UniProtKB/Swiss-Prot annotation:
Family per similarity comment: Belongs to the hssA/B family.
Lineage: Eukaryota, Amoebozoa, Evosea, Eumycetozoa, Dictyostelia
InterPro entries per record: HssA/B-like_chaperone, HssA/B-related
Full protein name: HssA/B-like protein 38
GO biological process, one term: sorocarp development
Region listing for Disordered, in residue ranges: 1-29
PANTHER family the record matches: HSSA/B-LIKE PROTEIN 1-RELATED-RELATED, HSSA_B-LIKE PROTEIN 1-RELATED
Domain of life: Eukaryota
């Protein structure tokens, strides 16, 4: 069972980052970069997890998409999060992977 909540029109004036859509719910992360990682981690953590995802995993580079780094067993994705350093650090901190 997965709950979906989309975040759109997220942009950074300094990097012209495109809008991102992330899925938040029962540990499933899909969408864009480290934001998706944070969303997957925050599935059971509610606002706290969501805050960590957006604050620590916010992608400032518009890099590659996450491949379910948190939700699918810990295979590190290709996110290039500027603040969080990508999916690895975010998932390591949020998910304990």
């Amino acid at each position: 069972m997965t709950l979906f909540s989309s975040i759109s029109s997220i942009s950074n004036p300094m990097t012209s980052s495109k809008s991102s859509i992330s899925s938040f719910g029962s540990g499933t992360s899909m969408g864009s970069n480290s934001i998706a990682c944070g969303g997957g981690c925050g599935g059971s953590g509610g606002i706290l997890g969501l805050g960590l995802g957006l604050g620590l995993g916010l992608d400032l580079t518009g890099g590659s998409r996450s491949r379910g780094a948190c939700g699918n067993g810990g295979n590190s994705g290709n996110g290039n999060g500027g603040m969080g350093g990508g999916n690895g650090p975010c998932c390591g901190g949020c998910c304990g992977i």
